[in-house]
């Protein structure tokens, strides 16, 4: 039986290995090499005078990590956190950051051949955050550039928060 086109194995250069997660009805993918770990929701400590996009900080094994809720960052409506809510811990330009997502779906590999450049707006997410769209057999996967989700200035503010 043939594999779906998006799941065919090619050379390592032809494949993207991604962590996929959901925010609302949209499914996003980020490069697995940026992801350090995925955690269940932890208690977030609010930080006075933190930027609006920062929820606060968590203590992860003795390291203080700033937390950003992607829902808020993307201008989506708030949602109560539940048993599926996760914190995706990533490293961006030497700064460790936790992004709150509604749920983590899976780790997957897709061929670069099934990706397309981003349309101007996808699911309310601005184009500059998106590197492309992966066309899977049963759904579309929005490929995020986490380095662009926070500007370099905002990344500097995160260092101050932590």
Each predicted region: which residue ranges?
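An acidic, low-aromatic, low-complexity terminal/linker signal
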Residues: 1-162
């Amino acid at each position: 039986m043939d594999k779906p086109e998006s799941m065919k194995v090619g050379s390592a250069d032809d494949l993207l290995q991604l962590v996929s997660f959901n925010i609302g009805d949209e499914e996003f993918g980020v490069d697995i090499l940026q992801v350090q770990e995925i955690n269940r929701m932890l208690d977030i400590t609010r930080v006075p005078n933190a930027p609006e996009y920062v929820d606060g900080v968590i203590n992860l094994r003795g390291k203080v990590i700033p937390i950003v809720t992607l829902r808020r960052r993307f201008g989506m409506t708030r949602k109560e956190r539940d048993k599926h809510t996760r914190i995706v811990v990533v490293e961006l330009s030497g700064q460790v950051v936790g992004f709150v997502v509604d749920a983590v779906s899976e780790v997957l590999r897709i061929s670069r051949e099934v990706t397309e450049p981003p349309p101007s707006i996808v699911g309310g997410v601005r184009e500059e955050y998106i590197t492309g769209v992966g066309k899977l057999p049963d759904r579309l996967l929005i490929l995020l550039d986490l380095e662009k989700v926070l500007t370099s200035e905002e990344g500097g503010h995160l260092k101050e928060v932590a």
